[in-house]
Structure formats: structure tokens, C-alpha cells
Amino acid sequence: MTADLPLPTSKDYTAESVFQPANLLREARRQRNLPDEPVPRVCLLDPDGDIAAHLASTGRGHRHTGWACYHTDMWVTDLAGTAVGVVARAVGAPFAVLVAEQLFASGADLVVSITSAGQLQPLADPPYFVLIDQALRDEGTSLHYLPPSPWSALPGHLKARLEPALHDLAEPVITARSWTTDAPYRETRAAIASAIEIGATCVEMEAAALYALAEARGLDIVCLAHITNTMAVWGTLHIAEEWSCCCTLLLYS
């Protein structure tokens, strides 16, 4: 078969979707007999699952009984007097955006993603955090929210409030660009070199799509990368012990 298979190109970025997260959540609550209970105003995406596991194993969190997502559970914990909802293992751009859409439809005002990432350019000795201010759109999900462009970005008002507070943390948090990919096992030498050449300092799988959602919908989303390894040299990931300082920063900024 040699014929080209064209991708759909009829994208109207201002048109409303026929399939809405609120409708799915309503049906999930009906089918599963769940209460119509809003989620905390601040919610955290935990792609690696370490934070949720930490809350479960230490008794510092409890399950949210009204979270109606078919694919995930939510743990709720108290951080500096504020309830925070944690959703684990929404890995990759499509899944992360699906869950983020459902979080906002369920009452969230701020969604934070903290994911482990591979270091492309050394900014400090790992482990350290990167506040992702721009993400290279090398994934497919963002194209359903915004017209094609190289980068998607942290909302400007959030960047302006967060950056001044970064200097007060013991754990290094550095503002920098990332490369968002859909295919971690296709990070070839040429692809890595290209990403580095245009300024990406780390590689992860969610930020570009989450920031596209934020821009398209006028939502508050912050993406942090926890730099735990260099490319092709994977170390043990330890996020749970260090997540609290970053979340506290976000809550008080």
C-alpha cells in the first residue's frame, strides 16, 4: 500500500467540543453511585506515582470519594492548611490533558504537574527541579488546542509570581525550557542534539500539551520537572521526599 493517509486538518480552535468532560464525569458518578463532591482547588498531577504512594504509605492522605475519573484515583492531603488533590500515573500528554480537563471540570483552580525528567543540559547537580517556562511541542495533543508553533508556555502571570520566590528554596528550582515527547524510546542522538540546539534543557512527556490547554482555555497550570538522571543513564527516582517544598511555593505565591 503506497497511498498517503492524510491526517485530519479541519481544526477550528474556537469551536466547542461535542464531547465534554463534565458530561463524562456526570455519567461516571451516575454509573458508580458517587457523590457530586468537588475536588480541592489545588490539584497535583503525579505521573511517576511516587507522591501518591508516599501519601498512602504514611497515612498522610485519604481517597477522594467523589473523584469520578474512570482511569485514576485521587488522594487528598493537607499542605500548609490547604487541601491538595493528588492524581497519580497520568503519564504522557494525552492522558495528562484528559485528567487535567476533568480536574478543572470538577472544581480545580490550579493544576500542578511534577514529573521526573531526563537532563539534556546540566543546570545543576541532580537532583534538582526545573520550572518549565517553555516546552517544545514534539507531541500530538497540543495541536488539538493551539495552532502549530514550536513552543507552548507557562502562563505569564504565573511565571511572574513564581520566579521571585524560587530563590528562597533550599532545593534548587531553575527556570528553563523542556522538550515534550510522545516517544521516549525514539530519543535518538539527532533528536536530542536538535532539542539541545534550540534551548531545551530536559525531556519529559506532558508539559507542552498542558500549557497548550492552559492557553486555549485560560486555565492556571504549572509544570515542574524533577531532574533525576541524564539521558540513557537512569537512576533511582526520589520525588516524594522533595515534593513538599515545591507545592508550598505554588500555594503561597
Q: Where in the sequence are the language-model features?
A:
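Accessory terminal and edge-of-domain segments that mediate assembly/interaction
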Residues: M1-V112, G118-S253
